[in-house]
Amino acid sequence: MSATHVFYKVEIDTKDSVQPIIYFRKAKRCSTAKGADRQHNRIVNETVDAWRQFSSQIMRYTVSRVPADVVVHGDIRTA
């Protein structure tokens, strides 16, 4: 599964919360570096659009690529 997919960790820091909101996105692996860069930008833009209604409460978005073993059957390991 990890050979055909990449995983993105999305962290959203809000003004009121001590802990960030964390979730993961899975996407098909790109064959080129330029494609991977475009895919990362797409994930960032989709995240910002999805959370736009809460933008006044959000301080920071962090989207990073993580290895497949960080997300195992819904469990979160340290990335």
Identify the meaning behind each predicted range.
Residues 1-26:
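Short aromatic-glycine-(Arg/Gly/Cys) micro-motifs in beta-strand/loop hairpins
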Residues 17-46:
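Short, flexible N-terminal segments of the mature chain
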Residues 4, 28, 34-37, 51, ...:
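Intrinsic disorder/low-complexity segments
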Residues 41, 45-79:
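Short, mixed-charge low-complexity intrinsically disordered segments
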Residues 6-12, 30, 36, 40, ...:
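Hydrophobic beta-strand residues in large extracellular and virion-surface proteins
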Residues 1-3, 13, 31, 46, ...:
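Intrinsically disordered/low-complexity terminal segments and short unstructured peptides
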